[in-house]
């Protein structure tokens, strides 16, 4: 629930600090399992079968698999699609273990992980659907350089990398600031946060949109970007601003109390 009395706002992140080992363990386990799920959707043909069961026409298996690739067994484009899922899981696992101090109950750990898996699965299926897959539109996936010659792939991969690194870096910078006892209760506005108040939100939206762009093309990429942008603009950012306003109000009241009672003497 969101902080405050505004029932229209919903906070997806707990603002209470707690270790929450079980919830975190569930989240980490499911995010790690997602990597294997996404890979097997491609490598074992589960994704192609699912697309066809849903009534779609999938790409041919030879466009997905590459027996000569001893690393993944996939064509270079689908190797990149797998890499996107690895990057998203790794970033979120690192965040929950080394950065986040917020409580994560069992329900949140399961729900947030499931949400990410659903989105990643949709991306994987769209990368296999002949109507949306870059592999079905003449993409040369026999080599990495040839794959990167596609504007959709190169732009998507660049935006994904920048967004993921920006989100992770900004969160580590804020974590380092908060760990200094002298900064207790102070808002952080340095590092990447000096560029934008909600740089981590924008970075997340960027890499999510880029992930979708690489898998499902421009329309799906724009739709995904728009979905997350709208969510953050109408829910995430207002919730955060309300939370920060409450903290400022509490700090102001404490200061007034200290002055009134001569706590600075």
Regions found by a protein language model. Name each.
Residues 2-50, 57, 67, 141-173, ...:
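Hydrophobic transmembrane alpha-helices
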């Amino acid at each position: 629930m969101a902080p405050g009395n505004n029932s229209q706002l919903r906070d997806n992140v707990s603002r209470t600090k707690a270790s929450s080992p079980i919830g975190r363990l569930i989240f980490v386990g499911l995010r790690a399992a997602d990597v294997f799920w996404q890979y097997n959707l491609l490598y074992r043909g589960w994704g192609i079968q699912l697309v066809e069961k849903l009534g779609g026409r999938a790409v041919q298996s030879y466009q997905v698999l590459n027996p000569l690739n001893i690393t993944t067994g996939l064509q270079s484009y689908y190797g990149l699609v797998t890499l996107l899922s690895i990057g998203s899981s790794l970033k979120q696992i690192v965040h929950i273990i080394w950065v986040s101090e917020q409580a994560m109950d069992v329900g949140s750990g399961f729900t947030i992980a499931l949400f990410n898996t659903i989105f990643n699965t949709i991306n994987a299926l769209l990368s296999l659907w002949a109507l949306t897959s870059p592999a079905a539109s003449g993409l040369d996936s026999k080599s990495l350089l040839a794959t990167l010659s596609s504007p959709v792939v190169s732009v998507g991969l660049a935006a994904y990398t920048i967004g993921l690194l920006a989100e992770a870096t900004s969160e580590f910078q804020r974590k380092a600031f908060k760990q200094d006892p002298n900064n207790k209760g102070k808002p952080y506005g340095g590092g990447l946060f000096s560029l934008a108040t909600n740089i981590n939100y924008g970075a997340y939206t960027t890499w999510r949109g880029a992930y979708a762009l690489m898998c499902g093309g421009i329309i799906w990429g724009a739709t995904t970007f728009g979905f997350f942008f709208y969510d953050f603009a109408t829910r995430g950012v207002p919730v955060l601003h309300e939370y920060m306003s409450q903290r400022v109000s509490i700090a102001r009241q404490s200061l007034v109390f200290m002055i009134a009672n001569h706590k600075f003497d």
